[in-house]
Amino acid sequence: MIRISQLKLKVGHTREQLFEEIIHQAHGKRPVSWQIVRKSVDARKKPQLFYVYTIDAEFENEKKLLSAKKSKWTRSTVVKYRFPYNKKDGSGASSTEVSTIDRAVIVGMGPAGLFAALVLARAGFAPIVFERGDCVEKRSEIVEHFFERGELDEESNVQFGEGGAGTFSDGKLNTLVKDKFGRNHFVLKEFVKHGAPEEILYEAKPHIGTDILKDVVASIRKEIESLGGEVHFRTKVCDILCEKISGSVAERERAEAEKNLLMQDKQLTGLILEKEGVQAEYPCRNVIFAIGHSARDTFYMLHERELSMNPKAFAIGVRVEHPAHLIKESQYGEGYPEEVPTASYKLTHQCKGTGRGIYSFCMCPGGYVVNSSSEKGRLCVNGMSYHDRAGHNSNTALITTVTPDDFPSDSPLAGLEFQRKYEELAYKIGNGKIPVQLFGDFLKNQMSTKLGKVTPSIKGEWQFAN
Protein backbone atom coordinates (compact mmCIF):
# COMPACT_ATOMS: atom_id res chain seq x y z
CA MET A 1 0.00 0.00 0.00
CA ILE A 2 1.30 3.46 -0.98
CA ARG A 3 0.41 6.71 0.77
CA ILE A 4 -0.05 9.71 -1.52
CA SER A 5 0.05 13.09 0.24
CA GLN A 6 -0.94 16.60 -0.84
CA LEU A 7 -3.27 15.56 -3.65
CA LYS A 8 -5.21 18.75 -4.41
CA LEU A 9 -8.46 19.25 -6.35
CA LYS A 10 -10.85 22.19 -6.63
CA VAL A 11 -13.91 22.14 -4.39
CA GLY A 12 -16.83 20.74 -6.37
CA HIS A 13 -14.99 17.83 -7.97
CA THR A 14 -16.49 14.35 -8.23
CA ARG A 15 -15.17 11.09 -6.79
CA GLU A 16 -14.44 9.96 -10.36
CA GLN A 17 -12.22 13.02 -10.85
CA LEU A 18 -10.37 12.16 -7.66
CA PHE A 19 -9.81 8.63 -8.96
CA GLU A 20 -8.55 10.00 -12.29
CA GLU A 21 -6.10 12.26 -10.43
CA ILE A 22 -4.70 9.26 -8.56
CA ILE A 23 -4.12 7.52 -11.92
CA HIS A 24 -2.52 10.69 -13.30
CA GLN A 25 -0.16 10.91 -10.32
CA ALA A 26 0.77 7.25 -10.91
CA HIS A 27 1.65 7.93 -14.57
CA GLY A 28 -1.38 6.07 -15.88
CA LYS A 29 -1.25 3.08 -13.54
CA ARG A 30 -4.64 2.19 -12.05
CA PRO A 31 -4.74 1.30 -8.37
CA VAL A 32 -6.06 -2.11 -7.37
CA SER A 33 -7.84 -0.41 -4.47
CA TRP A 34 -7.75 2.97 -2.75
CA GLN A 35 -9.23 4.88 0.17
CA ILE A 36 -9.21 8.41 1.55
CA VAL A 37 -7.08 8.78 4.69
CA ARG A 38 -7.48 12.52 5.22
CA LYS A 39 -9.40 15.39 3.63
CA SER A 40 -9.10 19.08 4.46
CA VAL A 41 -9.97 22.47 2.97
CA ASP A 42 -7.23 24.73 1.59
CA ALA A 43 -8.54 28.31 1.54
CA ARG A 44 -5.21 30.14 1.30
CA LYS A 45 -6.08 31.43 -2.19
CA LYS A 46 -9.72 32.29 -1.44
CA PRO A 47 -12.13 32.60 -3.12
CA GLN A 48 -10.39 29.69 -4.93
CA LEU A 49 -10.94 26.72 -2.64
CA PHE A 50 -9.36 23.28 -2.78
CA TYR A 51 -9.71 19.95 -1.05
CA VAL A 52 -6.37 18.44 -0.08
CA TYR A 53 -6.26 14.65 0.22
CA THR A 54 -4.06 11.97 1.66
CA ILE A 55 -4.78 8.69 -0.14
CA ASP A 56 -3.78 5.10 0.56
CA ALA A 57 -3.68 3.14 -2.72
CA GLU A 58 -2.64 -0.39 -3.62
CA PHE A 59 -0.74 -0.83 -6.90
CA GLU A 60 1.03 -3.66 -8.66
CA ASN A 61 4.83 -3.35 -8.52
CA GLU A 62 4.75 -0.72 -5.77
CA LYS A 63 8.50 -0.82 -5.21
CA LYS A 64 9.11 0.51 -8.72
CA LEU A 65 6.49 3.23 -8.29
CA LEU A 66 7.98 4.39 -5.00
CA SER A 67 11.47 4.63 -6.47
CA ALA A 68 10.16 6.86 -9.27
CA LYS A 69 8.07 9.24 -7.16
CA LYS A 70 9.01 12.19 -4.99
CA SER A 71 8.60 12.56 -1.22
CA LYS A 72 4.81 12.90 -1.50
CA TRP A 73 4.68 9.12 -2.01
CA THR A 74 5.62 6.83 0.88
CA ARG A 75 4.94 3.32 2.06
CA SER A 76 1.69 3.31 4.05
CA THR A 77 1.94 1.94 7.58
CA VAL A 78 -1.35 1.57 9.45
CA VAL A 79 -1.25 0.67 13.14
CA LYS A 80 -4.31 -1.35 14.15
CA TYR A 81 -5.31 -1.23 17.79
CA ARG A 82 -5.62 -4.55 19.58
CA PHE A 83 -6.77 -4.95 23.18
CA PRO A 84 -3.90 -6.91 24.79
CA TYR A 85 -5.99 -9.39 26.75
CA ASN A 86 -8.67 -11.76 25.55
CA LYS A 87 -10.27 -14.33 27.82
CA LYS A 88 -11.80 -16.04 24.81
CA ASP A 89 -8.47 -16.98 23.23
CA GLY A 90 -6.45 -17.24 26.43
CA SER A 91 -4.12 -14.30 25.71
CA GLY A 92 -3.26 -12.76 29.05
CA ALA A 93 -6.24 -14.05 31.05
CA SER A 94 -7.61 -17.27 32.45
CA SER A 95 -10.15 -19.03 30.28
CA THR A 96 -12.18 -19.97 33.37
CA GLU A 97 -15.38 -18.12 34.30
CA VAL A 98 -14.72 -14.79 36.06
CA SER A 99 -16.19 -14.76 39.57
CA THR A 100 -18.69 -12.04 40.43
CA ILE A 101 -16.33 -10.23 42.79
CA ASP A 102 -13.56 -10.22 40.15
CA ARG A 103 -15.68 -8.93 37.25
CA ALA A 104 -14.56 -5.54 36.02
CA VAL A 105 -16.82 -2.73 37.26
CA ILE A 106 -16.95 0.56 35.37
CA VAL A 107 -18.33 3.67 37.04
CA GLY A 108 -19.64 6.14 34.46
CA MET A 109 -20.71 5.65 30.84
CA GLY A 110 -19.17 8.59 29.07
CA PRO A 111 -16.64 7.96 26.28
CA ALA A 112 -14.03 6.39 28.58
CA GLY A 113 -16.50 4.11 30.35
CA LEU A 114 -18.31 3.23 27.13
CA PHE A 115 -15.17 2.06 25.34
CA ALA A 116 -13.72 0.37 28.42
CA ALA A 117 -16.91 -1.67 28.62
CA LEU A 118 -16.87 -2.40 24.88
CA VAL A 119 -13.31 -3.75 24.71
CA LEU A 120 -13.72 -5.74 27.93
CA ALA A 121 -16.99 -7.24 26.69
CA ARG A 122 -15.43 -8.24 23.37
CA ALA A 123 -12.53 -9.82 25.24
CA GLY A 124 -14.96 -11.98 27.21
CA PHE A 125 -14.78 -10.26 30.60
CA ALA A 126 -18.52 -9.43 30.94
CA PRO A 127 -18.07 -5.98 32.55
CA ILE A 128 -20.65 -4.29 34.77
CA VAL A 129 -21.36 -0.58 34.25
CA PHE A 130 -22.95 1.68 36.86
CA GLU A 131 -24.19 5.01 35.46
CA ARG A 132 -25.85 7.60 37.71
CA GLY A 133 -27.89 9.06 34.83
CA ASP A 134 -30.38 7.58 32.40
CA CYS A 135 -30.06 5.68 29.14
CA VAL A 136 -29.65 8.06 26.22
CA GLU A 137 -33.28 7.71 25.11
CA LYS A 138 -34.72 8.72 28.50
CA ARG A 139 -31.93 11.22 29.09
CA SER A 140 -32.80 13.05 25.85
CA GLU A 141 -36.36 13.58 27.08
CA ILE A 142 -35.11 14.91 30.43
CA VAL A 143 -32.62 17.28 28.79
CA GLU A 144 -35.24 18.68 26.41
CA HIS A 145 -37.56 19.26 29.38
CA PHE A 146 -34.75 21.12 31.15
CA PHE A 147 -34.10 23.30 28.10
CA GLU A 148 -37.79 24.16 27.87
CA ARG A 149 -38.74 24.48 31.55
CA GLY A 150 -35.47 25.02 33.43
CA GLU A 151 -36.19 22.14 35.84
CA LEU A 152 -32.85 20.44 36.52
CA ASP A 153 -32.47 16.74 37.29
CA GLU A 154 -29.15 16.56 39.16
CA GLU A 155 -28.59 12.90 38.27
CA SER A 156 -29.55 12.90 34.58
CA ASN A 157 -28.77 16.01 32.55
CA VAL A 158 -26.40 17.44 29.94
CA GLN A 159 -23.43 16.21 32.01
CA PHE A 160 -24.66 12.90 33.44
CA GLY A 161 -26.14 9.91 31.65
CA GLU A 162 -25.29 7.46 28.90
CA GLY A 163 -22.75 8.95 26.49
CA GLY A 164 -21.49 11.58 28.92
CA ALA A 165 -21.32 15.33 28.36
CA GLY A 166 -20.15 14.90 24.77
CA THR A 167 -23.54 13.55 23.72
CA PHE A 168 -24.94 17.07 24.03
CA SER A 169 -21.88 18.88 22.72
CA ASP A 170 -20.38 19.64 19.32
CA GLY A 171 -19.22 16.04 18.96
CA LYS A 172 -15.61 16.77 18.03
CA LEU A 173 -13.46 13.69 17.43
CA ASN A 174 -9.99 15.13 16.88
CA THR A 175 -7.11 14.95 19.33
CA LEU A 176 -3.55 16.28 19.45
CA VAL A 177 -2.34 13.21 21.34
CA LYS A 178 0.06 11.01 19.37
CA ASP A 179 -1.57 7.72 18.39
CA LYS A 180 1.21 5.13 18.34
CA PHE A 181 -1.19 2.32 19.34
CA GLY A 182 -3.89 3.06 16.76
CA ARG A 183 -6.52 3.87 19.40
CA ASN A 184 -7.89 6.97 17.69
CA HIS A 185 -8.68 5.19 14.45
CA PHE A 186 -10.12 2.27 16.38
CA VAL A 187 -12.58 4.62 18.11
CA LEU A 188 -13.58 6.26 14.84
CA LYS A 189 -14.12 2.89 13.14
CA GLU A 190 -16.31 1.76 16.03
CA PHE A 191 -18.43 4.88 15.70
CA VAL A 192 -18.88 4.16 11.98
CA LYS A 193 -19.71 0.51 12.69
CA HIS A 194 -22.47 1.71 15.03
CA GLY A 195 -23.99 4.25 12.65
CA ALA A 196 -21.77 7.32 12.38
CA PRO A 197 -21.04 8.69 8.86
CA GLU A 198 -17.98 7.17 7.17
CA GLU A 199 -16.38 10.55 6.48
CA ILE A 200 -15.33 10.85 10.13
CA LEU A 201 -12.56 8.38 9.25
CA TYR A 202 -10.79 10.95 7.09
CA GLU A 203 -12.17 14.46 7.65
CA ALA A 204 -9.54 16.81 9.10
CA LYS A 205 -12.09 17.88 11.71
CA PRO A 206 -14.35 14.84 12.18
CA HIS A 207 -17.75 15.49 13.71
CA ILE A 208 -20.84 13.38 14.39
CA GLY A 209 -23.43 15.65 15.98
CA THR A 210 -25.87 15.11 18.82
CA ASP A 211 -28.71 13.81 16.63
CA ILE A 212 -26.65 10.90 15.24
CA LEU A 213 -24.46 10.35 18.29
CA LYS A 214 -27.42 9.40 20.48
CA ASP A 215 -28.18 6.42 18.23
CA VAL A 216 -24.49 5.47 18.02
CA VAL A 217 -24.13 5.41 21.81
CA ALA A 218 -27.25 3.27 22.23
CA SER A 219 -25.97 0.82 19.60
CA ILE A 220 -22.64 0.40 21.42
CA ARG A 221 -24.50 -0.28 24.68
CA LYS A 222 -26.59 -2.97 22.99
CA GLU A 223 -23.44 -4.72 21.75
CA ILE A 224 -21.96 -4.65 25.26
CA GLU A 225 -25.11 -6.27 26.64
CA SER A 226 -25.22 -8.85 23.84
CA LEU A 227 -21.73 -9.98 24.86
CA GLY A 228 -22.67 -10.55 28.49
CA GLY A 229 -21.99 -7.10 29.89
CA GLU A 230 -24.44 -5.38 32.20
CA VAL A 231 -25.44 -1.71 32.25
CA HIS A 232 -27.28 -0.31 35.27
CA PHE A 233 -28.73 3.19 34.87
CA ARG A 234 -29.84 5.50 37.68
CA THR A 235 -27.30 3.70 39.86
CA LYS A 236 -24.96 6.04 41.73
CA VAL A 237 -21.73 5.05 43.46
CA CYS A 238 -21.89 6.79 46.85
CA ASP A 239 -18.86 5.28 48.56
CA ILE A 240 -16.10 2.70 48.28
CA LEU A 241 -15.33 -0.09 50.72
CA CYS A 242 -11.75 -0.90 51.68
CA GLU A 243 -10.01 -3.20 54.11
CA LYS A 244 -6.53 -3.34 55.56
CA ILE A 245 -4.08 -5.53 53.72
CA SER A 246 -2.56 -8.41 55.68
CA GLY A 247 1.08 -9.37 55.47
CA SER A 248 1.12 -11.97 52.69
CA VAL A 249 3.66 -11.46 49.92
CA ALA A 250 1.02 -11.38 47.17
CA GLU A 251 -1.07 -8.80 48.99
CA ARG A 252 1.97 -6.61 49.70
CA GLU A 253 2.91 -6.74 46.01
CA ARG A 254 -0.62 -5.64 45.13
CA ALA A 255 -0.39 -2.81 47.64
CA GLU A 256 2.88 -1.68 46.09
CA ALA A 257 1.26 -1.65 42.64
CA GLU A 258 -1.59 0.50 43.96
CA LYS A 259 0.42 2.85 46.17
CA ASN A 260 -0.17 5.82 43.89
CA LEU A 261 -3.94 5.34 44.14
CA LEU A 262 -5.04 4.15 47.58
CA MET A 263 -3.26 4.21 50.92
CA GLN A 264 -0.66 1.48 50.89
CA ASP A 265 -2.26 -0.54 53.69
CA LYS A 266 -5.73 -0.76 52.10
CA GLN A 267 -7.37 -2.57 49.23
CA LEU A 268 -10.73 -2.11 47.52
CA THR A 269 -13.40 -4.64 48.48
CA GLY A 270 -16.62 -3.10 47.18
CA LEU A 271 -18.87 -0.15 46.42
CA ILE A 272 -21.90 1.43 48.06
CA LEU A 273 -24.57 1.88 45.39
CA GLU A 274 -27.73 3.96 45.51
CA LYS A 275 -30.73 3.25 43.29
CA GLU A 276 -34.19 4.73 43.78
CA GLY A 277 -33.15 6.06 47.18
CA VAL A 278 -32.01 2.67 48.50
CA GLN A 279 -28.33 1.98 49.28
CA ALA A 280 -26.67 -1.42 49.08
CA GLU A 281 -23.19 -2.92 49.16
CA TYR A 282 -21.73 -4.39 45.99
CA PRO A 283 -18.60 -6.55 46.48
CA CYS A 284 -15.89 -6.07 43.83
CA ARG A 285 -12.13 -5.75 43.50
CA ASN A 286 -11.58 -4.31 40.02
CA VAL A 287 -13.09 -0.88 39.36
CA ILE A 288 -12.55 1.71 36.63
CA PHE A 289 -13.72 5.18 37.65
CA ALA A 290 -14.60 6.88 34.35
CA ILE A 291 -16.50 9.75 35.95
CA GLY A 292 -15.50 12.65 33.73
CA HIS A 293 -15.39 16.31 34.70
CA SER A 294 -18.49 17.12 36.70
CA ALA A 295 -19.08 14.32 39.25
CA ARG A 296 -17.85 16.56 42.03
CA ASP A 297 -19.56 14.63 44.82
CA THR A 298 -17.66 11.52 43.72
CA PHE A 299 -14.36 13.42 43.68
CA TYR A 300 -14.97 14.54 47.27
CA MET A 301 -15.86 11.01 48.35
CA LEU A 302 -12.71 9.55 46.79
CA HIS A 303 -10.61 12.29 48.39
CA GLU A 304 -12.07 11.45 51.81
CA ARG A 305 -11.15 7.82 51.17
CA GLU A 306 -7.52 8.92 50.66
CA LEU A 307 -7.28 8.41 46.93
CA SER A 308 -4.19 10.25 45.75
CA MET A 309 -5.11 13.46 43.87
CA ASN A 310 -3.36 16.49 42.44
CA PRO A 311 -4.89 19.83 41.37
CA LYS A 312 -4.83 20.61 37.66
CA ALA A 313 -5.05 23.75 35.58
CA PHE A 314 -8.18 24.25 33.49
CA ALA A 315 -9.84 27.01 31.47
CA ILE A 316 -12.75 29.32 32.17
CA GLY A 317 -14.52 31.96 30.09
CA VAL A 318 -17.56 32.80 27.99
CA ARG A 319 -19.27 31.65 24.79
CA VAL A 320 -19.33 34.08 21.85
CA GLU A 321 -21.88 33.79 19.01
CA HIS A 322 -21.57 35.08 15.43
CA PRO A 323 -23.70 34.64 12.30
CA ALA A 324 -22.40 31.45 10.67
CA HIS A 325 -22.37 32.99 7.18
CA LEU A 326 -19.99 35.76 8.31
CA ILE A 327 -17.46 33.20 9.53
CA LYS A 328 -17.75 31.31 6.23
CA GLU A 329 -17.17 34.52 4.27
CA SER A 330 -14.18 35.36 6.44
CA GLN A 331 -12.61 31.92 6.02
CA TYR A 332 -13.64 31.07 2.44
CA GLY A 333 -14.23 34.44 0.79
CA GLU A 334 -17.38 35.91 -0.72
CA GLY A 335 -19.42 33.65 -2.98
CA TYR A 336 -18.15 30.48 -1.33
CA PRO A 337 -19.71 27.21 -2.61
CA GLU A 338 -22.41 25.80 -0.37
CA GLU A 339 -20.77 22.38 -0.17
CA VAL A 340 -17.83 23.55 1.96
CA PRO A 341 -18.16 22.73 5.66
CA THR A 342 -19.45 25.32 8.09
CA ALA A 343 -16.34 27.32 8.93
CA SER A 344 -14.48 27.55 12.22
CA TYR A 345 -11.54 29.59 13.46
CA LYS A 346 -8.88 29.76 16.17
CA LEU A 347 -7.72 32.86 18.02
CA THR A 348 -5.01 33.32 20.64
CA HIS A 349 -3.61 36.29 22.55
CA GLN A 350 -0.97 36.76 25.24
CA CYS A 351 -1.69 39.52 27.78
CA LYS A 352 1.45 41.62 28.19
CA GLY A 353 0.71 42.67 31.75
CA THR A 354 -0.04 39.27 33.26
CA GLY A 355 1.39 36.86 30.72
CA ARG A 356 -1.90 35.00 30.84
CA GLY A 357 -3.08 33.50 27.56
CA ILE A 358 -6.56 34.05 26.13
CA TYR A 359 -7.74 31.81 23.33
CA SER A 360 -10.76 30.41 21.52
CA PHE A 361 -11.67 26.80 22.17
CA CYS A 362 -14.20 24.18 21.08
CA MET A 363 -15.56 26.10 18.10
CA CYS A 364 -19.14 25.04 17.43
CA PRO A 365 -19.99 25.94 13.80
CA GLY A 366 -23.69 26.20 13.00
CA GLY A 367 -24.60 25.15 16.52
CA TYR A 368 -26.18 26.26 19.76
CA VAL A 369 -25.18 27.47 23.20
CA VAL A 370 -26.72 25.08 25.74
CA ASN A 371 -27.28 25.19 29.49
CA SER A 372 -24.91 22.49 30.77
CA SER A 373 -25.60 22.78 34.49
CA SER A 374 -25.49 19.70 36.71
CA GLU A 375 -25.92 21.24 40.18
CA LYS A 376 -28.84 23.29 41.42
CA GLY A 377 -28.04 26.95 42.06
CA ARG A 378 -25.13 26.83 39.63
CA LEU A 379 -24.90 27.45 35.88
CA CYS A 380 -22.45 26.77 33.07
CA VAL A 381 -22.80 26.58 29.29
CA ASN A 382 -21.35 24.62 26.39
CA GLY A 383 -21.59 24.48 22.61
CA MET A 384 -23.75 21.83 20.90
CA SER A 385 -24.50 21.08 17.26
CA TYR A 386 -26.34 18.59 15.11
CA HIS A 387 -24.69 16.67 12.29
CA ASP A 388 -25.56 19.15 9.53
CA ARG A 389 -24.36 22.16 11.54
CA ALA A 390 -27.07 24.17 9.83
CA GLY A 391 -27.85 26.60 12.66
CA HIS A 392 -27.79 30.30 11.75
CA ASN A 393 -25.08 31.06 14.34
CA SER A 394 -21.66 29.68 15.16
CA ASN A 395 -20.20 29.92 18.65
CA THR A 396 -16.88 29.43 20.36
CA ALA A 397 -15.56 29.52 23.90
CA LEU A 398 -13.30 32.50 24.64
CA ILE A 399 -11.30 31.36 27.64
CA THR A 400 -8.22 31.78 29.78
CA THR A 401 -6.27 29.19 31.73
CA VAL A 402 -6.39 29.19 35.51
CA THR A 403 -3.83 27.29 37.57
CA PRO A 404 -3.66 26.08 41.18
CA ASP A 405 -2.12 29.46 42.02
CA ASP A 406 -5.53 31.01 41.26
CA PHE A 407 -7.44 28.62 43.51
CA PRO A 408 -8.60 29.57 47.03
CA SER A 409 -6.49 26.94 48.84
CA ASP A 410 -3.89 24.25 48.30
CA SER A 411 -6.44 21.43 48.56
CA PRO A 412 -6.42 19.05 45.59
CA LEU A 413 -10.11 19.92 45.19
CA ALA A 414 -9.72 23.70 45.40
CA GLY A 415 -10.29 23.92 41.66
CA LEU A 416 -13.80 22.55 42.17
CA GLU A 417 -14.57 25.33 44.64
CA PHE A 418 -13.23 27.83 42.11
CA GLN A 419 -15.61 26.41 39.49
CA ARG A 420 -18.55 26.45 41.86
CA LYS A 421 -17.92 30.08 42.81
CA TYR A 422 -18.27 31.29 39.23
CA GLU A 423 -21.11 28.93 38.37
CA GLU A 424 -23.02 30.34 41.35
CA LEU A 425 -22.32 33.89 40.16
CA ALA A 426 -23.51 33.02 36.64
CA TYR A 427 -26.70 31.51 38.08
CA LYS A 428 -27.30 34.56 40.27
CA ILE A 429 -26.86 37.27 37.63
CA GLY A 430 -29.12 35.39 35.21
CA ASN A 431 -31.73 34.47 37.82
CA GLY A 432 -31.15 30.83 36.95
CA LYS A 433 -31.18 31.47 33.20
CA ILE A 434 -28.26 31.74 30.78
CA PRO A 435 -26.88 35.30 31.12
CA VAL A 436 -26.63 37.01 27.71
CA GLN A 437 -24.76 40.19 26.81
CA LEU A 438 -23.75 41.93 23.60
CA PHE A 439 -19.99 41.67 23.17
CA GLY A 440 -19.62 45.44 23.04
CA ASP A 441 -21.45 45.76 26.35
CA PHE A 442 -19.26 42.99 27.78
CA LEU A 443 -16.19 45.07 26.99
CA LYS A 444 -17.86 48.14 28.55
CA ASN A 445 -18.91 46.17 31.64
CA GLN A 446 -22.56 47.12 31.24
CA MET A 447 -25.83 45.20 30.90
CA SER A 448 -27.37 44.88 27.46
CA THR A 449 -30.98 45.98 27.07
CA LYS A 450 -31.77 44.82 23.54
CA LEU A 451 -30.42 42.55 20.83
CA GLY A 452 -28.36 43.78 17.92
CA LYS A 453 -27.97 42.00 14.60
CA VAL A 454 -27.38 38.58 16.17
CA THR A 455 -30.29 36.58 17.60
CA PRO A 456 -29.01 34.06 20.16
CA SER A 457 -29.12 30.35 19.25
CA ILE A 458 -29.66 28.99 22.74
CA LYS A 459 -31.00 25.72 24.15
CA GLY A 460 -32.38 26.78 27.51
CA GLU A 461 -33.90 29.90 29.02
CA TRP A 462 -31.87 33.13 28.88
CA GLN A 463 -31.97 36.77 29.92
CA PHE A 464 -29.78 39.87 29.69
CA ALA A 465 -27.16 40.27 32.43
CA ASN A 466 -23.76 41.82 33.09
Task: Give residue ranges: language-model regions.
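Residues forming the flavin
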Residues: 1-51, 56-168, 172-251, 255-466
